[in-house]
Amino acid sequence: MSDEGKLFIGGLNFDTNEESLEQVFSKYGQISEVVVVKDRETKRSRGFGFVTFENPDDAKDAMMAMNGKAVDGRQIRVDQAGKSSGDRRGGYRGGSSGGRGFFRGGRGRGGGDRGYGSSRFDNRSGGYGGSSGSRDYYSSGRSQGSYGDRAGGSYRDSYDSYATHE
């Protein structure tokens, strides 16, 4: 399926659901799918979603008309989901599912996620890492790439090489 008529909707009120989103956007054309992305554990909205129109031209109209408008009291951002600014979409995908996988791996290693959480305090996580050899490698690999890791792009590189050190 093509992403042509698919719009990314960001900045949603956490109370906004599929029905209210569909109500707001349906005046621009026939909608084939509305998704509000929810947290798997808490089932609460994560503040963004997608609206897919049958006709890509309707999606463009909706994007022009709704970007920056308020829905349920919050200003939303509307963007095409599939175009080259889709690296934003990649960021969300990577940040949610990829990030969760990263934590899962960390937890299995006995608290590797602590290093991830405190990566801002490099000296502190360095202190943690001193006790075990594998952790040492983990923090040193981290210090050079902590920016990319957070963006959701290059964390996979350090994660993959991390896995081969077992």
UniProtKB/Swiss-Prot annotation:
Query: Which terms does the UniProt entry file under GO BP?
Result: cell migration; embryo development ending in birth or egg hatching; gastrulation; mRNA stabilization; negative regulation of nuclear-transcribed mRNA poly(A) tail shortening; neurogenesis; positive regulation of mRNA splicing, via spliceosome; positive regulation of translation
Q: Which SMART domains match?
A: RRM, RRM_1
Give a short account of its post-translational modification: Methylated on arginine residues within RGG motifs. Methylation by prmt1 promotes cytoplasmic accumulation.
Q: What induces it?
A: By tcf7l1/tcf-3.
UniProt biased composition (Basic and acidic residues): 157-166
Positions of the UniProt region annotated as Disordered: 68-166
Pfam families from the UniProt entry: RRM_1
Which cellular compartments is it found in? Nucleus, Nucleoplasm; Cytoplasm
Which coarse location class applies to the principal site listed for this UniProt protein?
nucleus
SUPFAM superfamilies in alphabetical order: RNA-binding domain, RBD
Question: Which residue intervals are annotated with compositional bias (Low complexity) in the record?
Answer: 133-149
Q: Where is the composition biased (Gly residues)?
A: 92-115
Domain (RRM): residue spans on this chain: 5-83
- Recorded superkingdom: Eukaryota
Note the Gene3D superfamilies from the entry.
Answer: 3.30.70.330
Assigned keywords, A-Z:
Cytoplasm, Developmental protein, Methylation, Nucleus, RNA-binding, Stress response
Recorded hits in InterPro entries, A to Z, give:
Nucleotide-bd_a/b_plait_sf (IPR012677), RBD_domain_sf (IPR035979), RBM (IPR050441), RBM3/CIRBP_RRM (IPR034278), RRM_dom (IPR000504), RRM_dom_euk (IPR003954)
In which tissues or organs does this protein occur?
Answer: In adults, most abundant in testis, ovary, brain and liver, with lower expression in kidney and heart.
What PANTHER family has UniProt attached to this entry? Answer: TRANSFORMER-2 SEX-DETERMINING PROTEIN-RELATED
- What's this protein's function? Cold-inducible mRNA binding protein. Acts cooperatively with elavl1/elrA to stabilize AU-rich element (ARE)-containing mRNAs by binding to them and inhibiting their deadenylation. Essential for embryonic gastrulation and neural development, acting to maintain the expression of a set of adhesion molecules, and cell movement during embryogenesis. Required for pronephros development.
Q: What is known of its domains?
A: The glycine-rich domain, which contains a number of RGG motifs, is necessary to regulate nucleocytoplasmic localization.
Subunit comment: Interacts with prmt1. Interacts with elavl1/elrA (via RRM3). Associates with ribosomes.
- This protein is called what? Cold-inducible RNA-binding protein B
- The organism is Xenopus laevis (African clawed frog)
